[in-house]
Amino acid sequence: MRITLVGMGSGAPGGLTVRGLAALQGAGLIIGARRLLQNLPDGCTDNRTALYKTDEICALLQGAGCEQAAVVFSGDTGFYSGAGALCRALDAAGTPYTVEPGVSSVQL
């Protein structure tokens, strides 16, 4: 499975990059905080699960059974975000992933 951690900046679709949008639109499963899932742009799967705890996200990803999954985060995925904890957990499990940062508040 290909896993992408997608930054959504402030949480609005305008905080997505082109690559982040492509990852979301190609995903068969999208995981994240409820408010982020409610703000996903058109063309994204309806297979969405509202989770934010790292251990719960990892468990769901392990049993997902889809080719591509995305986990959405607000904030800056490289600085202050839950993405850091998930990266550490995926690294510890030997699970490959990519990170697509969103538009951060510093850039706005």
Language model segments and positions:
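Class I S-adenosyl-L-methionine
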Residues: M1-L108
